[in-house]
């Protein structure tokens, strides 16, 4: 299977990095490599380091970017099979210690991951509950659904999925698993449908969409690793280097917005009448409001409707 994932906000994400001919850039979420391919076309002697924790994505990238991965290639691509929360240690291992010129994140889940039934991401295919981006980790969707407490389940469904029937769904999950384990995606879909009132199932898309999203976020600790990675990325940027982040969910965007605000504003310490002279912001926001997809892209790519791009520059 080949990646059919269509990159969202492609030009906006890369062009806002102000790519330098010989720059060093990090693609924190390589996926199908759409953003990386466009960035490589902008470089001459530069390097792109692509991170992905999904072994399948890395194996596909080795095929589709064979030329750029060859020793001595210019521009050069380096692939790293790891989570983007381990940026610094991997860069040090590669001998990079003087910073990077730019980094970007596309936080959408790649379409092929949903299209592989055995990955257990999708409510459209019947498969064992899994949802792990990194297939080597122990925690999976089956474990969460069958062992977490009713309160824990309710909390993640509400917090990560904005599911207003979170309590009803959590209660139904616990009741059902007392009878027998909830093993497959379709088992879980049936439980969710039973928990949601009939009137609510008739509108708003698939009734399991929000719950599946929430469980996926919990399985992969997506918000925790995002916050950790963004903090590290900002420290790794050289002065003038830029960071671009595409989000698709409100909880992701809130984290990006909060961290960008933290580093672009200087707080007056309590008890002091003014900002100390040596206190300076670390980032400059490229745009106060998030960059959204153009009308043309909205027509061509349905995924772009919820996409928000935020960009900042290291001072």
Swiss-Prot record:
Localization: Cytoplasm
The family database entries (HAMAP family) matched by this protein are listed as:
16SrRNA_methyltr_H
Q: Which NCBIfam families does its entry note?
A: 16S rRNA (cytosine(1402)-N(4))-methyltransferase RsmH
> What Gene3D superfamilies does this protein map onto?
Putative methyltransferase TM0872, insert domain, Vaccinia Virus protein VP39
Region: Disordered; residue ranges are 295-315
Q: What does this protein do?
A: Specifically methylates the N4 position of cytidine in position 1402 (C1402) of 16S rRNA.
Alphabetical GO CC annotations of the entry are: cytoplasm
What InterPro entries does this protein map onto?
RsmH, SAM-dep_MeTrfase_MraW_recog, SAM-dependent_MTases_sf
Which keywords annotate this record? Cytoplasm, Methyltransferase, rRNA processing, S-adenosyl-L-methionine, Transferase
UniProt name for this protein: Ribosomal RNA small subunit methyltransferase H
Q: Does the keyword Transmembrane apply?
A: no
Give the first-level EC class, as a single word. transferase
| Organism this protein belongs to | Lactobacillus gasseri (strain ATCC 33323 / DSM 20243 / BCRC 14619 / CIP 102991 / JCM 1131 / KCTC 3163 / NCIMB 11718 / NCTC 13722 / AM63)
Q: Where does S-adenosyl-L-methionine bind?
A: 33-35, 52, 84, 106, 113
Q: Which GO terms describe its molecular function?
A: rRNA (cytosine-N4-)-methyltransferase activity
């Amino acid at each position: 299977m080949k990646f059919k994932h269509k990159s969202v906000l492609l030009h906006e994400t890369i062009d806002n990095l102000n790519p330098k001919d010989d720059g060093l850039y990090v693609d924190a979420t390589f996926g199908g490599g759409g953003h990386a391919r466009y960035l490589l076309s902008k470089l001459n002697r530069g390097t792109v380091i692509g991170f992905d924790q999904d072994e399948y994505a890395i194996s596909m990238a080795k095929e589709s970017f064979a030329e750029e991965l060859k020793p001595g290639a210019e521009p050069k691509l380096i692939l790293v099979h790891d989570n983007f929360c381990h940026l610094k240690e991997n860069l040090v291992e590669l001998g990079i210690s003087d910073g990077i010129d730019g980094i970007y994140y596309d936080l959408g889940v790649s379409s092929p991951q949903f299209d592989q039934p055995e990955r257990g991401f999708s409510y459209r295919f019947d498969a064992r509950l899994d949802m792990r981006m990194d297939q080597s980790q122990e925690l999976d969707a089956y474990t969460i659904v069958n062992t977490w407490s009713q309160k824990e389940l309710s909390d993640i469904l509400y917090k990560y999925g904005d599911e207003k029937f979170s309590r009803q769904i959590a209660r139904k999950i616990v009741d059902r698993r007392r009878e027998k384990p909830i093993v497959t995606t379709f088992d879980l879909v049936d439980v969710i449908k039973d928990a949601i009132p009939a009137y609510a199932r008739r509108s708003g898309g698939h009734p399991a969409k929000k719950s599946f999203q929430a469980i996926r976020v919990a399985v992969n600790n997506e918000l925790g690793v995002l916050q950790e990675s963004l903090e590290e990325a900002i420290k790794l940027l050289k002065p003038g280097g830029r960071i671009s982040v595409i989000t698709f969910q409100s909880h992701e965007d809130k984290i990006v917005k909060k961290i960008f605000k933290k580093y672009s504003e200087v707080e007056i310490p309590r008890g002091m009448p003014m900002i100390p002279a040596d206190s300076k912001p670390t980032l400059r926001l490229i745009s106060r409001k998030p960059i959204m997809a153009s009308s043309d892209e909205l027509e061509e790519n349905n995924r772009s409707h919820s996409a928000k791009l935020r960009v900042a520059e290291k001072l």
